[in-house]
From Swiss-Prot:
Modified residues (Phosphotyrosine): Y595, Y601, Y778, Y927
Gene Ontology molecular function terms on file: ATP binding; GPI-linked ephrin receptor activity; transmembrane-ephrin receptor activity
Gene this protein is translated from: epha4-b
Family in the record: Belongs to the protein kinase superfamily. Tyr protein kinase family. Ephrin receptor subfamily.
This protein's name: Ephrin type-A receptor 4-B
Cleavable signal peptide: 1-20
Residues that hold ATP according to the record: I626, G627, V628, G629, E630, F631, G632, E633, V634, K652
Function comment: Receptor tyrosine kinase which binds membrane-bound ephrin family ligands residing on adjacent cells, leading to contact-dependent bidirectional signaling into neighboring cells. The signaling pathway downstream of the receptor is referred to as forward signaling while the signaling pathway downstream of the ephrin ligand is referred to as reverse signaling. Highly promiscuous, it has the unique property among Eph receptors to bind and to be physiologically activated by both GPI-anchored ephrin-A and transmembrane ephrin-B ligands including EFNA1 and EFNB3.
Record organism: Xenopus laevis
Tissue specificity note: Localized expression in a subset of neural crest and neural tissues in embryos.
Residue ranges annotated as motif PDZ-binding: 983-985
Cytoplasmic compartment segments: 570-985
PANTHER family assigned: EPH RECEPTOR A5, EPHRIN TYPE-A RECEPTOR 4
SUPFAM superfamilies according to UniProt: Fibronectin type III, Galactose-binding domain-like, Growth factor receptor domain, Protein kinase-like (PK-like), SAM/Pointed domain
Length: 985
């Protein structure tokens, strides 16, 4: 019976092979390690037992090529254990391999008398080994891969109809670690024929993506792993971003990242980089493709990165490679002169040929010549040009302060961006003129010869340029306090004058000007002198001892009076305060820079030109929008000014469709910022006004606004770090105060923080009008600003001073120490105003040092003259930083007993009837037993509790102690108010 079965299986196998064998093409992602059909001659695999088990059979395919197969069909006997082992298979670096088995299997039901012994499955095993010296099959060494079952089995009918049912099964094996392995097939009683066995591993084949080549890569050790592979740029290309891809377990490349770019002089073609053709160029690797040489240039070789200019044509250093080559301009045309005494006006027409460039400008050369017009020399610095001498964009200029009756030659040169590269070309036109008689120049000095009680005798030198015969001098004088509203004139033919009829001990301002036949010159600058108090000449040589003694005695008395007044004023406040009236008088010390309000300029654009640097828009690269401001978008980007390194900047843009007023208001902030130069004031890089959009360029602050930054980093900084931030803000505000600038909107949201935690004051563009609505804030063009940062006198009377900025600084201190908490929490603006008016102030934030909260309270003094100056604030913060121990003491106690503290966690006294009510309202019910056990059964006892008491009754958490004590303080304050014992500040 067994022989019959073997014969049936063999005949069926022969017919099958004729249909399925032949040359096969495998996917590129599969690398074959073993293919039984490609072996020439016998396979020679080891079988166990050697006889009566697996049998090697050779059959012919349709091309009469022998194919070696193995078959077994011991279905008549039970307990079969027939093993077949392949030769040693090297794994070739693969960590996971795949076994493809093609086989046929006889249906047990089609064989009579084998129901108890016939099987329809077989087992697949593997064994790893570093060599091929295994001669025997040691079953215990092998690891089972799987039990293989047929999807289809054949019967006797199929054999008769020559229908053979071939099964294909694939199993993966791994991870593998040794040099190679064996496969083994275990038959347990099936009628089976192994038609072919193929072992392979998968790889991601060599490929080129985004100009990067990725090599053949073997897949990972498991079916879900991804192998990261770094690509290498193809020839003549460079990395833009590191090229990477992932090799999937199925041999497919996934997720391409990064790319390469063809080098300058090369462009992409069919997955590679080819050189630019003759007549074409590519300047940068980031350019997409080669471009044809621009006009007046050529490229004679392949792979050019730029084109050479034709003879006589040039390219400026700042010109892009895509710009046509250009020439210097021809000379200006039609130069016309107009002489007006010692001034000359010149006008001309543009050059006939601009050289092909739009950047034509004009330089003016002035020469003073002798009578024969042969000996000429430069005019010197005394001559003035309007609008300027060099870099003129207009075709007219005025030359002033020339000498009278003098010959001058003026040359007008036309230049453009390539003029320096061809200095030999004549680009100028000239004209010679003779000036007329002119008025004299300004008197530069006035000196007092004698000063008495009612008169001043003056003398002065002749003007530097008389420009003719001086006919007379005119002296204008007035009292200092009159500011030229009422003045008198005295005329004299000499260089001196006696001014009489003056008031004693009064300051007078004097101006002098000279007159010739051509008219009056300009008045001199102001010179101030004060009359005496006693009828005597100036103290000097020849003064009597008596007069000298009286003068000295009077001076001593005056000094004593001033010292006494100073001491009295010092006693009024520990901060050396002086009563600040509604209109504060600004004392401008010599050498101290003072803020100039740009809105006082008749032409606001003049303020922008004076205080802000104009930047070429081509130097700016906008990268992304980071916010929306009052006038348009706020962006981040880069600024690269020629000759300087590239820096990150913030860019404010003016939205399209703006009005003249909006443009003026937008640029006013730049006019203000441009006057400031301090490490704690936001730095203005410049403006763009000559093209759209109009932009303000400032330094870039990486960490954004201080309030948001603190909220994002709640609790991460030490007290010293927070005080350092406050010190920086205070230093910036001291600088502004010293310049007589009042900020008006100092708040944490208007402080910017850079990557080094340096805080800088910003937002100088606000104009505010206080509305009558108590719930309103200062109305601006972009919205409303909450009044909870604003001093009470500024709210009530619009009194904005440095002292009101100090109040705002105190609120900023509170914001910093509370990590960006909203001042006064969710109270309405009307309630805030009312509470402040009644003497209430913000309590110390959690863990805030007492010294810092005391400084806050000093900043919040109702009388603005009692508040510290910014210089004193900075000095105090410096002392705290130098003495860190002074910052360790925290608590809720307060030396100002008449200042009630606000606390949102304190329940209303009227709503609390017992200790339990208070604990529930304050969310501290967990400590009910602690208070009860310690004997705190009434609210009258609770309001006297302190930190030691809380520790004693078992409440040890510092944060819980602070919050409970804060609530107790609020309860105590409300109780005092109800009993009439508290007097608001």
């Amino acid at each position: 019976m067994a022989g019959i079965v073997h014969g049936i299986l063999f005949c069926g196998l022969f017919g099958l092979c004729w249909a399925v064998t032949g040359s096969r093409i495998y996917p590129a992602s599969e690398v074959t390690l073993l293919d039984s059909r490609s072996v020439q001659g016998e396979l020679g695999w080891i079988a166990s037992p050697l006889e009566g088990g697996w049998e090697e059979v050779s059959i012919m395919d349709e091309k009469n090529t022998p194919i070696r197969t193995y078959q077994v069909c011991n279905v008549m006997e039970s307990s079969q254990n027939n093993w077949l082992r392949t030769d040693w298979i090297p794994r070739s670096g693969a960590q996971r391999v795949y076994v493809e088995i093609k086989f046929t299997l006889r249906d047990c039901n089609s064989l009579p008398g084998v129901m108890g012994t016939c099987k329809e499955t077989f087992n697949l095993y593997y064994y790893e080994s570093n060599n091929d010296k295994e001669r025997f099959i040691r079953e215990t060494q092998y690891v089972k891969i799987d039990t293989i079952a047929a999807d289809e089995s054949f019967t006797q009918v199929d054999i008769g109809d020559r229908i053979m049912k071939l099964n294909t099964e694939v199993r993966d094996v791994g991870p593998l670690s040794k040099k190679g392995f064996y496969l083994a097939f275990q038959d347990v009683g099936a009628c089976i024929a192994l038609v072919s066995v193929r072992v392979f591993y998968k790889k991601c084949p060599l490929t080129v993506r985004n100009l990067a080549q990725f090599p053949d890569t073997i897949t990972g050790s498991d079916t879900s792993s991804l192998v990261e592979v770094r690509g290498s740029c193809v020839d003549n290309s460079e990395e833009k971003d590191v090229p990477k891809m992932y090799c999937g377990a199925d041999g497919e490349w996934l997720v391409p990242i990064g790319n390469c770019l063809c080098n300058a002089g090369f462009e992409e073609h069919n997955g590679g980089c080819q050189a630019c053709k003759v007549g074409y160029y590519k300047a940068l690797s980031t350019d997409a493709a080669c471009s044809k040489c621009p006009p007046h240039s050529y490229a004679l070789r392949e792979g050019s990165t730029s084109c050479t200019c034709d003879r006589g044509y040039f390219r400026a250093d700042t010109d892009p490679a895509s710009m046509p080559c250009t020439r210097p301009p021809s000379a200006p045309q039609n130069l016309i002169s107009n002489v007006n005494e010692t001034s000359v006006n010149l006008e001309w027409s543009p050059p006939q040929n601009s050289g092909g460039r739009p950047d034509v400008s004009y330089n003016l050369v002035c020469k003073r010549c002798g009578s024969d017009l042969t000996r000429c020399s430069p005019c010197g610095s005394g001559v003035h040009y309007s609008p300027q001498q060099n870099g003129l964009k207009t075709t007219k200029v005025s030359i002033n302060d020339l000498q009278a009756h003098t010959n001058y030659t003026f040359e007008v040169w036309a230049i453009n961006g390539v003029s320096k590269q061809n200095p030999e070309q004549d680009q100028a036109v000239s004209v010679t003129v003779t000036t007329n008689q002119a008025a004299p120049s300004t008197v530069t000095q006035i000196q007092p010869k004698e000063i008495t009680r009612h008169s001043v005798s003056l003398t002065w030198p002749e003007p530097e340029r008389a420009n003719g015969v001086i006919l007379e001098y005119e002296v204008k004088y007035y009292e200092k306090d009159q500011n030229e509203r009422s003045y008198r004139i005295v005329k004299t033919a000499s260089r001196s004058a006696d001014i009489k009829g003056l008031n004693p001990l009064t300051g007078y301002v004097f101006h002098v000007r000279a007159r010739t036949a051509a008219g009056y010159g300009e008045f001199s600058g102001p010179f101030e002198f004060t009359t005496n108090t006693v009828p005597s000449p100036m103290i000097g040589e020849g003064t009597s001892p008596t007069v000298l003694l009286v003068s000295v005695a009077g001076s001593i008395v005056l000094v004593v009076i001033l010292i006494a007044a100073f001491v009295i004023s010092r006693r009024r406040s520990k901060y050396s305060k002086a009563k600040q009236e509604a209109d504060e008088e600004k004392h401008l010390n010599q050498g101290v820079k003072t803020y100039v309000d740009p809105f006082t300029y008749e032409d606001p654009n003049q303020a922008v030109r004076e205080f802000a640097k104009e930047i070429d828009a081509s130097c700016i690269k906008i990268e992304k929008v980071i916010g929306v401001g009052e006038f348009g978008e706020v962006c981040s980007g880069r600024l690269k000014v020629p000759g300087k390194r590239e820096i990150y900047v913030a860019i404010k843009t003016l939205k399209a469709g703006y009005t003249d007023k909006q443009r003026r208001d937008f640029l006013s902030e730049a006019s203000i910022m441009g006057q400031f130069d301090h490490p704690n004031i936001i730095h203005l890089e410049g403006v763009v006004t000559k093209c759209k959009p109009v932009m303000i360029i400032t330094e870039y602050m990486e960490n954004g606004s201080l309030d948001a930054f603190l909220r994002k980093n709640d609790g991460r900084f030490t007290v010293i770090q927070l005080v350092g931030m406050l010190r920086g803000i205070g230093s910036g505000m001291k600088y502004l105060s010293d310049m007589s600038y009042v900020h008006r909107d100092l708040a944490a949201r208007n402080i910017l923080v850079n990557s080094n935690l340096v805080c800088k004051v910003s937002d100088f563009g606000m104009s505010r009008v206080l509305e009558d609505d108590p719930e309103a804030a200062y109305t601006t063009r972009g919205g409303k600003i909450p009044i909870r940062w604003t001093a009470p006198e500024a709210i009530a009377y619009r009194k904005f001073t440095s002292a009101s900025d100090v109040w705002s600084y105190g609120i900023v201190m509170w914001e910093v120490m509370s990590y960006g908490e909203r001042p006064y929490w969710d109270m309405s603006n009307q309630d805030v105003i009312k509470a402040i008016e009644e003497g209430y102030r913000l309590p110390p934030p959690m863990d805030c040092p007492i010294a810092l909260h005391q400084l806050m309270l000093d900043c919040w003094q109702k009388d603005r003259s009692d508040r510290p100056k910014f210089g004193q604030i900075v000095s105090m913060l410096d002392k705290l930083i130098r003495n860190p121990n002074s910052l360790k003491r925290t608590g809720l106690e307060n030396s100002r007993t008449n200042t009630a503290l606000l606390d949102p966690s304190s329940p209303e006294w009227s709503q609390v009837a017992s200790v339990l009510d208070w604990l529930q309202a304050s969310k501290w019910k967990r400590y009910k037993d602690n208070f009860t056990a310690a004997g705190y059964t009434s609210l009258e006892a609770v309001v006297h509790v302190n930190q030691d008491d809380l520790t004693r009754i078992g409440i040890s958490s510092p944060s819980h102690q602070n919050k409970i004590l804060s609530s107790v303080q609020g309860m105590r304050t409300q109780l005092q108010q109800m009993q009439g014992r508290m007097v608001p500040v």
